[in-house]
Amino acid sequence: MAIPLITVLSRHCNFSNISVGKDRPKWFDRKKCLQNLIDTKSGEVDLNVKILFDGVQKTDHYVNDFDIPIININGGTGAKSYLRSIEYAKLLKSKYVYFVEDDYLHRQNWDKILLEGLKEFDYVTLYDHPDKYGDDYKNYKSNVRLTKSIFWKEVPSTTDTFACSIKTLKEDFDIHYDFSNRGHQGSLDHLRFLSLKDKGKHLYSSLPGWSTTVLSNYQSPLYDWKSLVDR
């Protein structure tokens, strides 16, 4: 089998303690998020999608409805699940890896946008986190860059949904490992990226966002994300 340019690791589980009780729109559906990830690829980027499943999926779990390889990992918490993900990714032969949590939606041709960023920056996210426009960041100054078809802005941190080269992941593995191993539930993503910035690594977010987490008050702005699941 040919080695893909990008390996997409879509992470799922039967139940998540840190996800329970989060405020989500009524139209949110994890199966539709996974279907959207597949349906919105351009087909022009050499990539391979794999499911990383924390634990053993139930027989009626939606991941079984997809013709996608499933790799079972043993995490048990969000932090340990992310830890198992980076351990798996470190051994990949592809040039890049894209970690995707199970509650994300993507716009059409997200793979082409992602690749533009990966060719330029250490770390890339397609999620334009709305907290960057609140009072906490009103004095924050960011570098803005332009690639072939989109703007990018440097951001201090993002979630566990991001992309980088395997080379970069290996270079920074100790930092990723440390902030996952220290997290009791979540993986301390904010502190992780601040530490990476201190090391001289840079994280850029597409502007506008080309993906979003599906939380009621934290969706990437200026796009009708519900339209992606109404199709």
Give the location of each predicted region.
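N-proximal low-complexity "stem/linker" segments adjacent to membrane-targeting elements
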Residues: 1-36
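Short loop->beta transition adjacent to catalytic acidic/histidine clusters or analogous donor-positioning motifs
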Residues: 5-6, 40-50
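Short loop/turn segments at strand-loop or loop-helix junctions that form parts
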Residues: 6-19, 54-55, 126-129, 208-209
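Phosphate/oxyanion-binding active-site loops and adjacent basic polyanion-contact surfaces
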Residues: 25-33, 74-82, 158, 184-189
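C-terminal catalytic/acceptor-binding lobe
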Residues: 25-26, 166-167, 171-231
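Active-site-proximal specificity loops/subdomain of glycosyltransferases
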Residues: 52-94
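Short beta-strand-to-loop acidic/aromatic patch adjacent to the donor-nucleotide binding site
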Residues: 94-105
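Conserved catalytic core of nucleotide-sugar-dependent glycosyltransferases
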Residues: 105-176
